[in-house]
Amino acid sequence: MAAAAPAAAAASSEAPAASATAEPEAGDQDSREVRVLQSLRGKICEAKNLLPYLGPHKMRDCFCTINLDQEEVYRTQVVEKSLSPFFSEEFYFEIPRTFQYLSFYVYDKNVLQRDLRIGKVAIKKEDLCNHSGKETWFSLQPVDSNSEVQGKVHLELKLNELITENGTVCQQLVVHIKACHGLPLINGQSCDPYATVSLVGPSRNDQKKTKVKKKTSNPQFNEIFYFEVTRSSSYTRKSQFQVEEEDIEKLEIRIDLWNNGNLVQDVFLGEIKVPVNVLRTDSSHQAWYLLQPRDNGNKSSKTDDLGSLRLNICYTEDYVLPSEYYGPLKTLLLKSPDVQPISASAAYILSEICRDKNDAVLPLVRLLLHHDKLVPFATAVAELDLKDTQDANTIFRGNSLATRCLDEMMKIVGGHYLKVTLKPILDEICDSSKSCEIDPIKLKEGDNVENNKENLRYYVDKLFNTIVKSSMSCPTVMCDIFYSLRQMATQRFPNDPHVQYSAVSSFVFLRFFAVAVVSPHTFHLRPHHPDAQTIRTLTLISKTIQTLGSWGSLSKSKSSFKETFMCEFFKMFQEEGYIIAVKKFLDEISSTETKESSGTSEPVHLKEGEMYKRAQGRTRIGKKNFKKRWFCLTSRELTYHKQPGSKDAIYTIPVKNILAVEKLEESSFNKKNMFQVIHTEKPLYVQANNCVEANEWIDVLCRVSRCNQNRLSFYHPSVYLNGNWLCCQETGENTLGCKPCTAGVPADIQIDIDEDRETERIYSLFTLSLLKLQKMEEACGTIAVYQGPQKEPDDYSNFVIEDSVTTFKTIQQIKSIIEKLDEPHEKYRKKRSSSAKYGSKENPIVGKAS
């Protein structure tokens, strides 16, 4: 919508107050929205046995991409000169749209020409659950037009009767090709599709063709074609609406989709075949069909020769009900920190019965953090950890529930802390080409090891000094937990003066700073993956920082490094000044003293990245109107710059002036993944690189501006061009929007937590683990009633059960709540299943109809 102040004021309104609602009956959610939320988490591990080059230089420079259908949403770093590249890159993102295939493409990087696709792994959406949480080797498949087929066609067939002038009868077949949806991208762009419609039989092949639709993956054809089916017999009333059995069985309609190549060869997009005998019992047939590869596709390719790819994939689809349904489960979980012993709490029991503790940790941490319950819960489970720790040197070094909870907490709340502390120096390291290799075996020809040592020491010193002076920026919740850890460690090992520091450093240095240094892209500190030399530099820095921060190693005469060259290098830092600085920093971040807030005076860095923006105020549509710019968002302003690192912004929008952030219809500029930032001047139209990136920008912009005054209630989903809005045809530029703005999101700009979604995830985990929950319940019952001699530990070693009676009661509560939640979920699943009729857009026909 145009951002004139009077129109904006007229469009804004206060949201009505929510009324108190009694606990709903099962099935009451029918009249309210059930949110279907998708996410993908996993790891691209490695590829092996890739095809070598034919020439003398056989090695390849490889990278891997993740694609939703054919839209790239993630890219790994380039691994140079390898036929078995080791990527080891973790990924996580929300999936904002429907998709048919999740694909992984392995590329050979080519500087002068287009990158070469070596092969791909394509997994149907419905098959993703078969690979959830498991590392699997997949054979690479060849990439050609046949393997890239995707999308669906909406088709209607009718059979009419015609009587010719000479009295013979023929059947007229009416083919209405209505639309297509989700056609593949061609070279990363929307295609120019057209369809050929053929009636095929033993002795005929009549073909017709639609018009070409420009730059769209969802063309609306709405074209009707007529085919005559002649009959040898003369017209009789008896056979008036019959087609001879031998004819109808042999005729079929074939629709082929093509991309118009103009000056180059047209590209095959897929085909469907519909036998005419679908009209045997009905004179009309209408359905959506899934596009298929050609029957004579390339079946001879030796796919085993292309190599293989090892992946770990976890796809999640949550059906989030209205908030009222989650009240009892949420209440039970939030009581967990107060349960004695903590092992009898609902949150702890969930971690015990889940196949992978990590699955339970993330939703638990986010839910408890949202309600300020994480510190007492983490303290309680850490205390349980300490009971089993016999050696102070191994304190909090394992992967227990306590350490995993704290790891996730630091990732969630520590993002801004890392940006203000590490990002400037990491930018300097990544943008520089200084060599820091000090391993004699890995030195390149011409390298000077002494110069490299000085380079490495410069970076380590600069990073170390920044970290130890950053205590004022450390988030309060981290400080609170560090304080608790320090106190508990001192009580557990009162005779060890260093344990109070190692308890804190094992988290803040080993699991926080050191990890962020070695993988800055994972923590959103860098927009792209570093090259191989930079990764090596960051690894050496990370090792040194990790050891510097480990108070235990500083109290010994020797460092903990295994490599001789690292031991020699670390001698530069074994000075009293470093020890004092570490101790002072750890004291400050584990203190309960109130800190002067530094977060409110400095803007919080939220997101940055390269996107395309449309020149404002232009009245024509054209490629030149879209410019590539570097966007930066803080808690105060949205800016864009000519390139990364530019200090002077080309354009600035204060966050307080943002009135709405909404998606823009693809038809506005014939471009995908566009959104609009509506503010007090002309709307800013932006194109993201993919749907995931667009969704992330919309979410963070909505969060940061959610509490602004005069936010819009209605907006225009298209653009104002040539004197009218394309969406509603209104002529006034300041006309009230024609579509309601989407619902708001949580207002916390640093921590975006959807508590209903997290509770739904926990419900799903309990549901998947009911068998183990039952076994735990049986174990509690056995322990409670058993009066004989003490049993071997193996009998109950699968579970931590300190108090069988309290644990049993909690399990009973969990089962009762889950059983009640099952009812609305089952009702929704049945309703969804019945609405997705075979042949509908949601459930298209695969293969030939019958």
Curated annotation (Swiss-Prot):
Q: Which GO terms describe its biological process?
A: intracellular signal transduction; negative regulation of Ras protein signal transduction; signal transduction
Q: Which cysteines are joined by disulfide bonds?
A: none
List the molecular function annotations (GO) for this entry.
Answer: GTPase activator activity; phospholipid binding; zinc ion binding
In this chain, the stretch annotated as Disordered covers: 1-32, 825-850
> What name is this protein filed under?
Ras GTPase-activating protein 2
Matching InterPro entries, A to Z?
A: C2_dom, C2_domain_sf, PH-like_dom_sf, PH_domain, Ras_GTPase, RASA2_PH, RasGAP_CS, RasGAP_dom
Q: In this protein, which residues make up the domain named PH?
A: 604-706
For the modification Phosphoserine, the affected residues are 555
Q: Does the keyword Metal-binding apply?
A: yes
Name of the gene this protein is made from = RASA2
Q: Which GO terms describe its cellular component?
A: cytosol; perinuclear region of cytoplasm
- The protein's site described by Arginine finger is found at 397
Q: Which domain of life is it from?
A: Eukaryota
